[in-house]
UniProtKB/Swiss-Prot annotation:
Family named by the database record: Belongs to the universal ribosomal protein uS11 family.
Gene Ontology MF: a single term: rRNA binding
Keyword line: Chloroplast, Plastid, Ribonucleoprotein, Ribosomal protein, RNA-binding, rRNA-binding
Tree of life domain: Eukaryota
One Pfam family here: Ribosomal_S11
Coiled-coil ranges per UniProt: none
Ranges of compositional bias, category Basic residues: 9-24
GO biological process, one term: translation
Protein name: Small ribosomal subunit protein uS11c
UniProt main location, coarse: plastid
PANTHER family, per database record: 40S RIBOSOMAL PROTEIN S14/30S RIBOSOMAL PROTEIN S11
Gene that specifies this protein: rps11
Amino acid sequence: MAKSPPRSGSRRPGRIGSRKSGRRIPKGVIHVQASFNNTIVTVTDVRGRVISWSSAGTCGFRGTRRGTPFAAQTAAGNAIRAVADQGMQRAEVMIKGPGLGRDAALRAIRRSGILLNFVRDVTPMPHNGCRPPKKRRV
């Protein structure tokens, strides 16, 4: 069966420019998710809408290098550079996960010049929930 031709006007016209860059954000929340394989840094406003994000993978690190502290530092610097231009002065930091990039990302955030209200560890800890997987035998 042949495809029908696309209808004109069925899609909305594309937005020119970014609507996120027009806002002034004086205060925000910086979420750092540090796993053993990667570190993801997300900057949101206080209502939780994403303003900027970066990860070690998007910064050009591949394979095992994504889990390194230097990769986390680079990812945090990239995410914060975008929001510093939008006027963010204060932030809260939420750190999640056991990865190596936790401290390096926090160091990069402190060096950026944004005042930190508090730093909170929000790593999920089970209250003896699900049974963990069996131990590996190598």
